[in-house]
Swiss-Prot record:
Lineage summary: Bacteria, Pseudomonadati, Pseudomonadota, Gammaproteobacteria, Chromatiales
PANTHER family: FRUCTOSE-1,6-BISPHOSPHATASE-RELATED (PTHR11556), SEDOHEPTULOSE-1,7-BISPHOSPHATASE, CHLOROPLASTIC (PTHR11556:SF35)
Organism: Nitrosococcus oceani (strain ATCC 19707 / BCRC 17464 / JCM 30415 / NCIMB 11848 / C-107)
Annotated Mg(2+) 1 binding sites: E92, D114, L116
Cofactor(s) needed: Mg(2+)
Localization annotation: Cytoplasm
Record's catalysed reaction(s): beta-D-fructose 1,6-bisphosphate + H2O = beta-D-fructose 6-phosphate + phosphate
Residues binding substrate, per UniProt: D117, G118, S119, S120, N209
Protein name as annotated: Fructose-1,6-bisphosphatase class 1
Ranges in coiled-coil conformation: none
GO BP terms, alphabetized: fructose 1,6-bisphosphate metabolic process; fructose 6-phosphate metabolic process; fructose metabolic process; gluconeogenesis; sucrose biosynthetic process
Binding site for Mg(2+) 2: D114, D117, E281
EC numbers for this chain: 3.1.3.11
Family in the record: Belongs to the FBPase class 1 family.
Length: 335
């Protein structure tokens, strides 16, 4: 018998603390949780039911899709379009926004999601996950357009991710701290196991793809060189490097023990401002990290203050332990 609250109970208790709450937000979160449970089940059984491997298609980003990318996207859409809580959706896998079919009622929220982050790892049994961001639909809008989604990250109502690893974990923030829930497979419920998650201000761990070092801008080169010099250098401590190529895994590690994650601009394609998507990855993860006491930046700007220009806009991402990210920001200011 669990003494900690189920996620459903936790959400309802939060709702009761807000006198004006109607239950729509609670209902939406519960629907997202249900979709993530379904994806978790398929990820766990992928090799047994022949849903691993390439789908033979590309997404809007021009990236080859895995079978589970397509299946996970369909699960999110099919689980949420009929509920009456959403005005529209947007997916990293789809070019335009996803309207709510006419036969279903429309709600007051907009949902953006990456249905299976890190899916390049799925065939080699490394953790993947689902990332989502909830925005309010403008009050006077009955048929949302893409422009209605172009809100800065500071306007997010809620952000979360579900990581499908040795255990399935759901991490959530609604702007009042960060909480983590573990899926009990026996009863099919998420249990609060990591209340009030906080990122340590200091760290001795960085995550970056070192194979791209020659393409980085000078401030990032300088920061990483400082770390690599260890105790003998200006940092006076030894650092460890991590790189999983799965943002949900990287951010979850930072939430539990600190660290800095960097996916900076590089000169391989200098006209691209970055690699990660602002609306589906950078904004929700930045909201979570900041609510846990961390910092998130492009190096030059707070990510949550970026005014989006498109739903598939890309940005550089530097996030994690406060003192490390602020050091990288300072190096950019000095450059």
């Amino acid at each position: 018998m669990h003494s900690n609250p189920f996620l459903t109970q936790f959400i309802l208790e939060e709702q009761r603390s807000i006198p004006s709450a109607t239950g729509d937000f609670t209902g939406l979160l519960n629907d997202i949780v249900t979709a993530c449970k379904t994806i978790s089940h398929l990820v766990n059984r992928g090799g047994l039911i022949d849903i691993l491997g390439a789908a033979g298609t590309e997404n809007i980003q021009g990236e080859g899709q895995k079978k589970l990318d397509v299946i996970s996207n369909d699960i999110m859409v099919n689980s949420l379009e009929w509920t009456g809580h959403l005005g529209a959706m947007a997916s990293e896998e789809i070019e335009g926004i996803i309207p709510i079919p006419g036969q279903y009622p429309k709600g007051k929220y907009l949902l953006l999601f990456d249905p299976l982050d890190g899916s390049s790892n799925i065939d080699i049994n490394i953790s993947v996950g689902t990332i989502f961001s909830i925005l309010r639909c403008p009050d006077d809008v009955s048929e949302p357009t893409q422009e209605d989604f172009l809100q800065p990250g500071t306007q997010q109502v809620c952000a979360g991710f579900c990581v499908y690893g040795p255990t399935t974990m759901m991490v959530l923030t609604a702007g009042h701290g960060v909480n983590g829930f573990t899926l009990d497979q026996d009863i099919g419920e998420f249990i609060l196991t990591h209340p009030n998650m906080t990122i340590p201000e200091d760290t001795m761990e960085f995550a970056i793809n070192m194979s791209n070092q020659r393409f980085w801008a000078a401030p990032v080169q300088r920061y990483i060189e400082d770390c690599l010099q260890g105790k003998e250098g200006c940092r006076n401590k030894n650092f460890n490097m991590r790189w999983v190529a799965s943002m949900v895994s990287e951010v979850y590690r930072i939430l539990t023990r600190g660290g800095i994650f960097m996916y900076p601009w590089d000169s391989r394609d200098p006209d691209k401002p970055g690699r990660l998507r602002l609306m589906y990855e950078a904004n929700p993860m930045s909201f979570i990290v900041e609510q846990a006491g961390g910092v998130s930046s492009t190096g030059d700007q707070r990510i949550l203050e970026i005014n989006p220009e498109g739903i598939h806009q890309r940005v550089p991402v530097i996030l994690g332990s406060k003192n490390e990210v602020e050091r990288v920001i300072a190096y950019h200011q000095e450059a």
